[in-house]
């Protein structure tokens, strides 16, 4: 794994792998267990200070390497996903509301429906031909007698447009 990294690893991971697998040159020991390089105290101090400065520079590069790794889900992406889920739920609620209102409008009182504006005729389509049927007067009397609405005289405008004015009694 030395010197190579896959797309998923950052420089920090690579650094940790290298530090474990390859010892630093100052750690080499001879067969007796002593450092193979003998140094004077001054050279040791200078070398130690120099190594410390390099480590600080390496530390900074390790931080930038680690932060420049592959991008996980960003905050913007997660917010977009949440918004999309919220919009889908809102659309479902709106559809349910519209369906409910539509169903309620279908359940309105049939005695006040536009069919009874023209009680003497009903056009029915059979095989592409319109057939006119008349209702018996008793049918209209029955529905009006048991309705909660009362029909009043229509104005000339209402007669032309086919509007029905109704009054509710309680």
UniProtKB/Swiss-Prot annotation:
Residue span of motif SOFL-B: 61-70
Subcellular location: Cytoplasm; Nucleus
Motif Nuclear localization signal: where in chain: 79-86
Function: Involved in cytokinin-mediated development.
Summary of the tissues where the protein is detected: Expressed in seedlings, roots, flowers and siliques. Barely detectable in leaves.
Cytoplasm found in the keyword field: yes
Biological processes annotated in GO: cytokinin biosynthetic process; cytokinin metabolic process; cytokinin-activated signaling pathway
Keywords assigned: Cytokinin biosynthesis, Cytokinin signaling pathway, Cytoplasm, Nucleus
UniProt-listed InterPro entries: SOFL
Statement: the UniProt record of this protein carries the keyword Nucleus: yes
Biased composition (Basic and acidic residues): 35-44
Family: Belongs to the SOFL plant protein family.
Name of the protein described by the UniProt record: Protein SOB FIVE-LIKE 5
């Amino acid at each position: 794994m030395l010197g190579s990294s896959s797309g998923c690893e950052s420089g920090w991971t690579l650094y940790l792998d290298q530090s474990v697998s390859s010892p630093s040159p100052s750690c080499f020991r001879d067969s007796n267990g002593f450092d193979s390089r003998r140094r004077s105290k001054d050279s040791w101090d200078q070398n130690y200070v120099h190594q410390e400065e390099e480590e600080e520079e390496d530390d900074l590069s390790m931080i930038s390497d680690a932060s420049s790794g592959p991008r996980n889900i960003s905050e913007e992406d997660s917010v977009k996903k949440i918004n999309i889920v919220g919009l889908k739920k809102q659309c479902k609620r709106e559809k349910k509301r519209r369906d409910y209102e539509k169903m309620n409008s279908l359940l309105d009182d049939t005695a006040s429906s536009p069919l009874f504006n023209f009680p003497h005729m009903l056009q029915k389509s059979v095989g592409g031909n319109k057939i006119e049927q008349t209702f018996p007067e008793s049918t209209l009397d029955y529905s009006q007698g048991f309705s909660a609405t009362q029909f009043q005289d229509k104005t000339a405008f209402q007669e032309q447009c086919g509007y029905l004015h109704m009054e509710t009694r309680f």
